[in-house]
Amino acid sequence: MTQKLIYFLSQTHIRSAIAEAWAKRLSLSNVKFISGSWHKSKSTPFIAEALNEFAIEPPESLSYSPSSELLADADLIVTIYDSVHETAPKFPANIQEKIIYWDIDDPEQEIALPQKWASYQEVCDNIALSVKNLEHVLIEA
């Protein structure tokens, strides 16, 4: 059985790292999950804190930049963007059929600390639900 490659991609790696962490908890033995960003990768302690509420560690893997080779190798590319504050990246026509988009708020848009923390918690919950729904798609495929 060939292992599928699922690539989570977001602007600064924050939401894609959260998605990778949730996805690695799925019971899918034939799937490899990686994450990356289309802009400079950013790190924040809020990622670990939001995931630790669910006893999940953030991924230790690198942020993979979307190279032509990686995009071609991926079986599914999950592009996570905030439609209010970001523009989703454009992809070559030959890979459009393997791209899905999740419109999930960018928690870094919040400035005040209490609101930013609440936003991270909400984003973590939304990504968890999206990943769980993705599991059903992958099982059926």
Give the positions of each predicted feature.
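Conserved active-site segments centered on acidic
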Residues: M1-S68
